[in-house]
Amino acid sequence: MTWICLSCMLWPEDLEAPKTHHFKVKTFKKVKPCGICRQVITREGCTCKVCSFSCHRKCQAKVAAPCIPPSSHELVPVNTETAPKNVVDTGEAASRGGNTRKSLEEDSSTRVTPSVQPHPQPIRNMSTSRTTEDSCELDLVYVTERIIAVSFPSTANEENFRSNLREVAQMLKSKHGGNYLLFNLSERRPDITKLHAKVLEFGWPDLHTPALEKICSVCKAMDTWLNADPHNVVVLHNKGNRGRIGVVIAAYMHYSNISASADQALDRFAMKRFYEDKIVPIGQPSQRRYVHYFSGLLSGSIKMNNKPLFLHHVIMHGIPNFESKGGCRPFLRIYQAMQPVYTSGIYNVQGDSQTSICITIEPGLLLKGDILLKCYHKKFRSPARDVIFRVQFHTCAIHDLGVVFGKEDLDDAFKDDRFPEYGKVEFVFSYGPEKIQGMEHLENGPSVSVDYNTSDPLIRWDSYDNFNGHRDDGMEEVVGHTQGPLDGSLYAKVKKKDSLHGSTGAVNATRPVLSATPNHVEHTLSVSSDSGNSTASTKTDKTDEPAPGPASAPAALSPEEKRELDRLLSGFGLEREKQGAMYHPQHLRSRPVGGPAAPSSGRHIVPAQVHVNGGALASERETDILDDELPNQDGHSVGSMGTLSSLDGVTNTSEGGYPEALSPLTNGLDKPYPMEPMVNGGGYPYESASRAVSAQAGHTAPMRPSYSTQEGLAGYQREGPHPAWPQSATTSHYGHDPNGMFRSQSFPETEPQLPPAPARGGSSREAVQRGLNSWQQQQQQQQQQQQPRPPPRQQERVHLESLGLSRPSPQPLAEPPMSGLPEFPRAASQQEIEQSIEALNMLMLDLEPATAGAPLHKSQSVPGAWPGASPLSSQPFSGSSCQSHPLTQSRSGYIPSGHSLGTPEPAPRAPLESVPTGRPYSPYDYQPCPTGPNQSYHPKSPATSSSSSFLPTTQSSVGPQQPPASLPGLTTQPQLPPKEVTSDPSRTPEEEPLNLEGLVAHRVAAYNARLQGTGRRVSSWHPPLHRLRSSSLSGVQAREKQPAEPPAPLRKRAASDGQYENQSPEPTSPRSPGVRSPVQCVSPELALTIALNPGGRPKEPHLHSYKEAFEEMEGTSPTSPPPSGVRSPPGLAKTPLSALGLKPHNPADILLHPTGEEDERKVLTELSEEPRSYVESVVRTAVAGPRTQEPEPKSFSAPGAQAYGHETPLRIGTLGGSFVSPSPLSTSSPILSADSTSVGSFPSGESSDQGARTPTQPLLDSGFRSGSLGQPSPLAQRNYQSSSPLPTAGSSYSSPDYSLQQFSSPEGQARSQFSVAGVHTVPGSPQARHRTVGTNTPPSPGFGRRAVNPSLAAPSSPSLSHRQVMGPLGTGFHGNTGSSPQSSAATTPGSPSLGRHPGAHQVSNLHGNVVTAPGSPSLGRHPGAHQGTLASNLHSNAVASPGSPSLGRHLGGSGSVVPGSPSLDRHVPYGGYSTPEDRRPTLSRQSSASGYQAPSTPSFPVSPAYYPGLSSPATSPSPDSAAFRQGSPTPALPEKRRMSMGDRAGSLPNYATVNGKVSSSPVASGMSSPSGGSTVSFSHTLPDFSKYSMPDNSPETRAKVKFVQDTSKYWYKPEISREQAIALLKDQEPGAFIIRDSHSFRGAYGLAMKVSSPPPTIMQQNKKGDMTHELVRHFLIETGPRGVKLKGCPNEPNFGSLSALVYQHSIIPLALPCKLVIPNRDPTDESKDSSGPANSTSDLLKQGAACNVLFVNSVDMESLTGPQAISKAISETLAADPTPAATIVHFKVSAQGITLTDNQRKLFFRRHYPLNTVTFCDLDPQERKWTKTEGGAPAKLFGFVARKQGSATDNACHLFAELDPNQPASAIVSFVSKVMLSAGQKR
């Protein structure tokens, strides 16, 4: 037994010889606890000059501890024998010194003398004598007084490790009580969460670096916790190489330096010494690189590069000697956000250190975010591979197209003698996928051979999937406790077991290298792909072999869950078993029992049996490119680009080894950990370990594929709440809204998990939010799904119990804190990656540590979370509501997912009530809440007052007002039963006060509070809108609601709007006394700065291809910066961070009003907007997350809707006012409101004044993201939101008159009635809300693109409205908002369904059908569209019965409209032009689940008449006709018509006026592929709505808007292809242009313009041939946080919308060759006039043709070609065992050749066969048929023969089977043979 001094933590050498202390009186500047009474020494106290022991002067006499000079201890030999630690640090033997023994001292050899440092501060005796690498002991070091590093060597054996863990836990509890928060930086372990009350999971693979945004999240979380309470300490736990701790310490050192204060200088110095002394020698180059990135981004020395980079070549200068005879057999694996995106062939290189080898990637591989490139050596004739080198970097810090890493910069290689001393690796990038000219010299010589057989499991095996596999830690032993601090004695007795020193756990040693289960995580859908869709391609790598289940019987998935999983996964090509893993966080988190993964450098032997992708990988080289359109990346992401990017490093077994086969067994843990998506895919369960479902809670952990790491935070309270946390009873529902939390969670989130702390995951922001929500949601859902839904509180309890934790009886406000802090899920989708990058920027922005004044402010921790404070909920979540439950309040309506849609959720009533109106003091709550409860959200409050009057009834009063029944639009639902009202208390999961005790959670909570508060304030009634942040936010789509789970109103950010629409307004909760003003996290200055720098989010949601994807997925628009309560560190706002893309906030989003209503407004805005900071997002998410679960019906309660009336006065223009003439508006104009007329879309002269708005003025835009169509201004939102928290939701028409009336704002500013885009509830449908665009200017084309939400409005449930479940459609699964996967959105007659994309989300539902009963106008933003959105491949049919106008933004989609029902395009009702996007029948960007929407190329002509000589008039080759002919999505731009009834001055202008397209027919062909090949025909005219009688105040009637002529319909052609654009422009005058949606970069736009002469380089290259095509130049318009800009043109500003960009360039060319000439007529009309019938092959070829087919196989033919090759290939394929699995691919034929795109990335991303390589194409000569696995008639087989890349003689035959009956194989073959090949021959 050993004694340890609790005060100084030193181990006395001789307890028997006490020495007298030498006390001196000292005034303590820093808070320090008394060593005797443990109370804080506030002013004067005594401190010993020798040992630094401190106490109160009055306690001095009680001191009994001997004075032990530190020096004596430094000399004390470490008693290694007593140290049970045999833990071997992976590669680094981190442990040192005896157990908890202050090995600190050892480490702190530099220990500061007492004179300098009164406290035992980091006794850093970095004694070099003890090499950390060899130490096998626990190493506990006080890096600073409040930061403790606990490290164990990876080799420590489990028994010793567990023993040490217990001892450390005892020591921490005895010394710090409950004031420590443990950050687990290594894989998750159940025992850690059992031993420690508060744990945040930020783990990542050992020896790797975390995602940049994860670093931000950790710093933010640490700062929040440390600032929350002077007693709080942070414990960094790591098992493995201490480099992980070093990264965090160094990053926090830089982070804290931003707002540095003199009193912290010593701490920073201590951190610096610790890092330099202990970490640098053992760290990895990439870890140092990331610390440098982080430091540079914070300081501004590194500018954020948001451009996507395409990697073309990886050149190794110097050949490593891995073979006995020299040379090596390298192959590359490239991971984006820890998701594999590319695997090269295996190069066989013989050479020496002077030789170079180039690995070429064609086409270029798109990389964005956190990138990991590993080069392996495949051993010759051995199933093993060695790591040659590994390098991690982040594209945001790459500014050169050539990057060189020397040996010292390469992980693994830097200390490997086999790698040449002067060797280096060079990366060659470009800004496009096209081959780089002039790089031919990089070709390898003939001696280098390449084997493209990447299907070998060894090659495919990824080593990051089991990083967090569930492990059984066997913590059955009781912690050998003590007597000690617990019994008041000064010393704690720690029982120590003798352990064999140095015995390393056999774990690693024995761990079979060959785990039966290869890690597949990498292959899981890569959540991180840009597209936000997980890339199945990444999956390709994964093996199907299931991993053994965990020992604990995993709970089996319920049939419903299985179905849901299957449905969701079906698009990914993943089997459920793989998914299974995802479900279980335990698995994910637990590591193989075997122990830590072996160092990645280890050799991996891959089981041969693993088959990739079901085998049948084409031998041909695959390019696994994560395209922006990766299809469903749900698997998690996120971390947006980095989300996944951050993938929280899941290295499960380090690369070195496979996860132990045991891993599954490992966890017996009863408490499932929140599922963290694996680092890689995070969520996708790989067969291996993940797969097991946690038996424990009996719930399956919901799969959160995209869960970003940070999301995990949400899982923070993984364990039961601990008493400390104040939590309202309702907490139980922690954000179960799957949507809210999980991206694509279609699975029930059965596993209870604590809300993760704000760890920022894929998209940190999102992740955080998700995290918070996720835990809540998961818990709730799990409970709900698994059990009858008990009341929320009860559910919560149940959850906890299921976890094995019993929760103290609910206390309304103070729940015990959950033991777990938020943890974040692991994977991120591409989107997430993007988001994460964006988030990263935001994060960095947000990172600014809070200034001393408001320690919490910085992150604005969750208000109420602190025990003393009212629960989070009580604080306004975003400060918005003062009410006791900020979280709950806001969306009180939230219904646990379990409830059926219509069922009200039992809401625990009281928490809210229990809390006094004024919220209790909460550290986080900086802003006092308004005094009166009512104050909370009154439309009338001054800020809002302007609009308040608008409402007929001033329900605004906080009272439990009933929704004004009178409001026509609001048909309020019958008042919700009290419980619903009360539901308020039952916080939506998001609202649930997370039991995040202090900590980030608080911050999060605060944000949530702010968000929620506002929402709440709006009306607690409203069911929490699900803040779907785009449901598929980072790649994760909000998980679709399970059938069982009621769709909750989503608060989604309109896909295009970039803001969340409340899917349904939440009824105001009577209780929500008033929402208090939101806590302001951001100082007004910062807010202003942010406002001025909307860089945070693309103003036009679609604009940013990558970011957009994330954002779309997130569905969040930037929210206003945290309210002023917190000041950002000085200068931070000015730092480039904002430039970093730290999700700067759209100024418009930021409500600067500091006061009451204004605050509320802010809150509302914030709610609707995307959180600006990750914390905020977390908060928001927390707030919103739960909402998600609420049934949408709940949201119906119109009360909120009524609020609509209070539109915020719009500064911008009068509603009716004519459109402000567009003046070039630079994006910089902070206020461009998304929709605000001139603001966002077009520059407007008035817009400038917006910029000037005073903080008090609500930014009109705040409600809108620039470009966001529907968001009402915050005021408006707030007003109407009073009824609904989300701005949009609230906008339901509350007043009879839809037009926003102008109210003079209290400020006295008269706001012109700007039509605020708001969600209007159509009269009669309480819930449905239509988001109208208030701006006069056409929104940027992108607006409509975002997610579609299904709107299910049961007759009774007004609120259904559409939940925009799916984030961007592309993202992967489209979540169903409907309760059923296929939820069809049906609105009963009379209840208009105003879904933004009702249909869309329908699409998102798989095959959702939207049916509108006759008479019920469906105002879906894209009702049909998403329906029509072929994109989703799902075939959703939207049928509007006659009589029911369907106002879908893209009604036409694929859905068919019954003849009688007018289909109003997006906002048809409002008259005006539809935005270009609106006009697009299908959401171009929404592309289907596959995530990739191919260019809208015409289908293959079936009739011979199409071919030369027989051209049919109908099919004129003109690009225009071609597009339309095929029914391709090319938008038919109807003439703009004004509704006859639309001439009302008050009407809200809607861009979309009557541009609506009616889809006259459903997709004709089965090609509903995202590629857009589907044939959808749209009528070009809109029905005259005037014929349909609609209430006078209906949106249609109000639709009169006068715009300056909108020419966008002439120049914005979203669906045309590049070739069509060229054809349209080649005969035009210079300056003519067309903007289309980029088909290569999702979310970006292509500008094609005619110039007078081609560039000189082109002239030289093409001296012969037709130069007319070269006169049409192409530019990429990329979207970013600040809007849109020309890519690659540094002197180009950012513009708030495409319109702004176009008008500016029509005035001055800037970087363009000449000015743009704005057309006054449609070029397609001209081309039709000028072009005769196409009868030449060249015309047809220019047009191209495409459709979807089944790719069967590719067979090597050597030199064989012709029909014999086709026949032979088919024979071999059919005879193969097993028969290859067919994959749907997009088959496009053009003048360039044949391009195959695997929309789901199952086999490859895209393959192109140039025209000159294709030699033959024909049907099977033997007429054999292909039997489809899914059934159906046998399909004809056909194929083409093409020369293999790089060979002049060898051919390969590529076989296909017809898929679409309307596109028979014969038509395809005819086109290829008669058109393409014949054209090639003529040349």
Swiss-Prot record:
Pfam families: C1_1, PTB, PTEN_C2, SH2. Transmembrane segments: none annotated. It is an enzyme of class 3 (hydrolase). It is found in: Cell surface; Cell junction, Focal adhesion; Cytoplasm, Cytoskeleton. Keywords: Actin-binding, Cell junction, Cytoplasm, Cytoskeleton, Glycoprotein, Hydrolase, Metal-binding, Phosphoprotein, Protein phosphatase, SH2 domain, Zinc, Zinc-finger. The modification Phosphothreonine is found at residues 988, 1337. This is Tensin-1. The gene is TNS1.
